[in-house]
Amino acid sequence: LYNPDSIAAAIRRLMDGSLFTADELIQHHDLYHSLLHHGSFSAPTADECLERINARLSAGAEFLAAADRIIITFGTSYVYRWKGTGLVVGNCHKMPDSYFRRERLSVDEIADTWLPLMDCIHRRRPTLKWIFTVSPVRHLRDGAHENNLSKSVLLLAIEKIISHYPTIANYFPAYELMMDELRDYRFYAEDMCHPSPAAVRYIGDRFESTYMDAKTIAWLRRAEALHRDLQHRPFRPDSEAHRLFVVKTKLKQDQLRAELPT
């Protein structure tokens, strides 16, 4: 999700835990879709689509209930509204443009959506912290000027939101790091819109040094190494060497899980 309205809708749903129903789906090209979800949730039947969506919703709600921080990244202030209902969609599923109305949210519209949401969550979870960022990915469909206007709206909206909750919300300058410290085009991928791997590492390192202590960073490095091990695809899965690799990987996984705070 990239726009503030859809992100807020997702968090609201995760907090109240209400399951999706068939009347929230649409059928297009022999598939059932949710306008709030990625295409990977779409399915040939409504039941299968809902099963995928609600399983992920339940897992996400459980994860959010245990979280002590929420990191929010706004990508664009442009939204697409489904003409039938006025709903701001998270995914158009490659349907015709004529089904949607495109518009740019204002600073006040974004703040008016997020402030009541955060107030509601803060009353239930007073210790929960928020980290807001603006994505450095450039949305150039309408040109660089429109992208800059869109990002400006996001920056001003976040400033307004944080000013209401200075003790529980702050801003991480991912966008500014890309625009100022990494402004050379060698820090962009070939599409000239996304940050290069080097830029991603640079911004990630700055995030770690801002929000994590040395012990947490060490855990993160171990988790990254473990993730690489788990993604390994053996040439000979029936070999003794691979069996030992699996045993060692499971041991590292158990050790890390035992050390991490619950």
Where are these regions (language model features)?
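Extracellular glycan-modifying ectodomains
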Residues: 1-262
